[in-house]
């Protein structure tokens, strides 16, 4: 599938930021694609310009990895996140119970003030992947956190029998983990209230690929769904959701759409928890495949970015590491992919989402598939730039609007109530 887009389309791409309104809450932006790749060195060190703005991709100033449009906080960059290193070394006590919540929040507040301007309106993504805040979610290598919690309970409650110590270990871990995650989000939202705060990879889905094609459906695992229901407090404390739609290595192309669809549908399900209006859902997607380093093909962009737009997501965040700007050759390689494949598709999808919004939703909502089970029609412009037929799409109204086509003003559903 080839997108034939003229210069007029490139020049006509609207920016995600405008009029000082928070990112993604400006009513004219039904779908955004954001750049979370540390590519500043391409221009600064090698003189290779990446025309992200012209291609409809929102990036930080100077294409820095951290900035006012998007900032991701890794485990050592916000507060005192406890975890075990690869060799078992405990950092910040290793487990949530060992961390002083007051000290954690004080350090996090200092880092937020230092990293984000007071008027920050972008995405604030917390990447804490070492443990799950629910005891049952810590299996495999994460069982180290259960073992350390049991040892903690034995020290703190030496007179209890082993079963009671296990109960104390579980309760202590879950209570401390919840406090760390919930209060960190609350702190961020208090200090930078116009930003969109949430944790990367949440909600989880458990529909990864394990090499068995005969019974793969793409549905989320029942245990993952149950854990997400238990994490009601996390969704209530968030102001955006950032699920991952990284295509698993070896996943056959026939299953790409189901894999992405069910991950996003689970995010839409929990996005309503604790909020009068659904939280924005922005899926994290990779530029390349994890094992091979091969860039996503046109069809794979359709099954990630295209499916996200057609399901009604607020946007997609494109992630990459320093390898993309490690040399002049890599920078030219990245530029070629941007200009030849990724950029034209992003322009097409974002303009199609805009056209559908205005045609079906009075410009006050985003289009989403009426029946996600019939994923035949995408938000694509035809070659030459003409809009498609949007009969397969219904409207998801922005804050402050309601009705089948988002034509009814509802001031009581304004952003201040919804966040």
Swiss-Prot record:
It is found in: Secreted; Cell membrane; Cytoplasmic vesicle, Secretory vesicle, Acrosome; Endoplasmic reticulum. Its EC number is 3.2.1.35. It comes from the Eukaryota. Highly expressed in bladder, spleen and liver. Expressed at low levels in the kidney. Glycans are attached at residues 69, 215. One of its GO terms (biological process) is positive regulation of acrosomal vesicle exocytosis. N-glycosylated. The keyword Glycoprotein applies. One of its GO terms (molecular function) is hyalurononglucosaminidase activity. Disulfide bonds join 42-331, 205-220, 356-367, 361-395, 397-406. Residues 1-16 form the signal peptide. The active site is at residue 129. It catalyses: Random hydrolysis of (1->4)-linkages between N-acetyl-beta-D-glucosamine and D-glucuronate residues in hyaluronate. Keywords: Cell membrane, Cytoplasmic vesicle, Disulfide bond, EGF-like domain, Endoplasmic reticulum, Endosome, Fertilization, Glycoprotein, Glycosidase, Hydrolase, Membrane, Secreted, Signal. InterPro entries: Aldolase_TIM, Glycoside_hydrolase_SF, Hyaluronidase, Hyaluronidase-3. One of its GO terms (cellular component) is sperm midpiece. SUPFAM superfamilies: (Trans)glycosidases. Residues 352-407 form the EGF-like domain. The keyword Coiled coil does not apply. Belongs to the glycosyl hydrolase 56 family. Facilitates sperm penetration into the layer of cumulus cells surrounding the egg by digesting hyaluronic acid. Involved in induction of the acrosome reaction in the sperm. Involved in follicular atresia, the breakdown of immature ovarian follicles that are not selected to ovulate. Induces ovarian granulosa cell apoptosis, possibly via apoptotic signaling pathway involving CASP8 and CASP3 activation, and poly(ADP-ribose) polymerase (PARP) cleavage. Has no hyaluronidase activity in embryonic fibroblasts in vitro. Has no hyaluronidase activity in granulosa cells in vitro. This is Hyaluronidase-3. It comes from Sus scrofa.
């Amino acid at each position: 599938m080839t997108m034939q887009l003229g210069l007029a389309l490139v020049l006509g791409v609207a920016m995600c930021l405008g009029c000082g309104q928070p990112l993604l809450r400006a009513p004219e932006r039904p779908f955004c694609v954001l750049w979370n790749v540390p590519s500043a060195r391409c221009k600064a060190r090698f003189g290779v310009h990446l025309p992200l703005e012209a291609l409809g991709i929102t990036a930080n100033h100077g294409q820095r990895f951290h900035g006012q449009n998007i900032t991701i906080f890794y485990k050592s960059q916000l507060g005192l996140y406890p975890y075990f290193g690869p060799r078992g070394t405990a950092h910040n006590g290793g487990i949530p119970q060992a961390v002083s919540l007051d000290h954690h929040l004080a350090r996090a507040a200092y880092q937020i003030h230092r990293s984000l301007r007071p008027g920050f309106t972008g995405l604030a993504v917390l990447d804490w992947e070492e443990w799950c805040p629910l005891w049952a979610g810590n299996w495999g290598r994460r069982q180290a956190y259960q073992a350390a919690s049991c040892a903690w309970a034995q020290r703190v409650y030496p007179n209890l029998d082993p079963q009671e110590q296990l109960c104390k270990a579980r309760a202590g871990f879950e209570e401390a983990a919840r406090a760390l995650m919930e209060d960190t989000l609350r702190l961020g939202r208090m200090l930078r209230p116009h930003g969109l705060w949430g944790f990367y990879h949440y909600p989880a889905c458990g529909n990864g690929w394990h090499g068995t094609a005969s019974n793969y459906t793409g549905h989320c695992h029942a245990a993952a769904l149950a854990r997400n229901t238990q994490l009601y407090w996390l969704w209530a404390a968030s102001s955006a959701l950032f699920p991952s739609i990284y295509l698993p290595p070896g996943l056959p192309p026939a299953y790409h759409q189901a894999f992405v669809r069910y991950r996003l549908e689970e995010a839409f399900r929990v996005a309503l928890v604790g909020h009068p209006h659904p939280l924005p859902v922005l899926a994290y997607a990779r530029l390349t495949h994890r094992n091979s380093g091969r860039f996503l093909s046109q069809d794979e962009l359709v099954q990630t970015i295209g499916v996200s737009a057609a399901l009604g997501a607020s946007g997609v965040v494109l992630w990459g590491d320093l390898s993309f700007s490690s040399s002049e050759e890599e920078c030219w390689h990245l530029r070629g992919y941007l200009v030849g494949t990724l950029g034209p598709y992003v322009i097409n999808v974002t303009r199609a989402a805009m056209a559908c919004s205005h045609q079906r939703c009075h410009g006050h909502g985003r289009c989403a598939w009426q029946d996600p089970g019939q994923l035949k029609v995408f938000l694509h412009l035809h070659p030459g730039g003409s809009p498609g037929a949007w009969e397969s799409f219904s409207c998801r109204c922005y804050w402050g609007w309601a009705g089948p086509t988002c034509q009814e003003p509802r001031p009581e559903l304004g952003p201040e109530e919804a966040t």
